[in-house]
């Protein structure tokens, strides 16, 4: 009781490895971490999060929608997305181009050092006026440059809204949470992806740490068998 009175005992959550097959959590010692990690080629997804154009988005005088391009190797965590993390001192750019699938005009934000991974150099300042679906080379041009810290606080529309991940559900679990915003942290790099990290605090130690620091809330939409919970539409079960 003395430990409790002194504030040394408290209830909280932490991120732990979990085995759906065994139906139990596993310690890092049981898994011999970090020795269990190995480099493998895996499928990744680049996801477009639609920015809300209000006073918190410091990019002004841009026609059309603006999207944050985020990269993930765990697309099954996207329904639990609560934030986007950028590097505070990384250089980012706003690029005007076309969506290669819908062929509609679009403005996207990503890290400047990674532009060449998504856009061909010969397409820079290309022919926007005559672009159409049959044109192989996407025209693009940089409209603005800024630091990651300039994006902090910008808001975006929830990617996959459903009955199970409403704001009310999130705030029921974590009262006062303010999800769906851009936050900053030093763990973000420009080695892979877009320089914008999809952040789901329930899945991953870094995500949980920055989520707690920035009051994103927490949302676990996978059950103990590794299946999506009810309320996620076609994804459930």
Task: Give, region by region, the residue ranges found by the protein language model.
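NTP-handling and nucleic-acid-processing catalytic cores
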Residues: 1-225
């Amino acid at each position: 009781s003395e430990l409790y009175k002194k504030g040394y005992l408290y209830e909280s959550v932490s991120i732990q490895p979990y085995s759906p097959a065994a139906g139990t959590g596993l310690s890092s010692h049981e898994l011999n971490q970090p020795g269990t990690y190995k480099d493998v080629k895996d499928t990744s997804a680049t996801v477009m999060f639609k920015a809300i154009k209000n006073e918190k988005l410091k990019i002004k005088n841009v026609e059309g929608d603006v999207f944050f391009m985020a990269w993930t190797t765990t697309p099954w965590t996207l329904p639990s997305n609560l934030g986007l993390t950028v590097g505070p001192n990384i250089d980012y750019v706003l690029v005007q181009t076309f969506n290669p699938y819908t062929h509609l005009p679009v403005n996207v934000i990503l890290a400047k050092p990674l532009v060449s991974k998504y856009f061909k150099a010969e397409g820079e300042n290309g022919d926007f006026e005559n672009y159409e679906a049959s044109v192989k080379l996407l025209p693009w041009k940089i409209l603005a440059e800024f630091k990651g810290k300039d994006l902090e606080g910008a808001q975006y529309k929830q990617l996959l809204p459903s009955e199970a991940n409403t704001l009310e559900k999130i705030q029921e679990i974590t009262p006062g949470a303010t999800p769906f915003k851009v936050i900053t942290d030093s763990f973000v790099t420009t080695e892979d992806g877009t320089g914008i990290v999809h952040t789901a605090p329930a899945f991953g130690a870094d995500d949980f740490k920055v989520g707690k620091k920035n009051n994103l809330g927490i949302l676990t939409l996978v059950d103990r068998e590794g299946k999506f919970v009810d309320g996620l539409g076609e994804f459930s079960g």
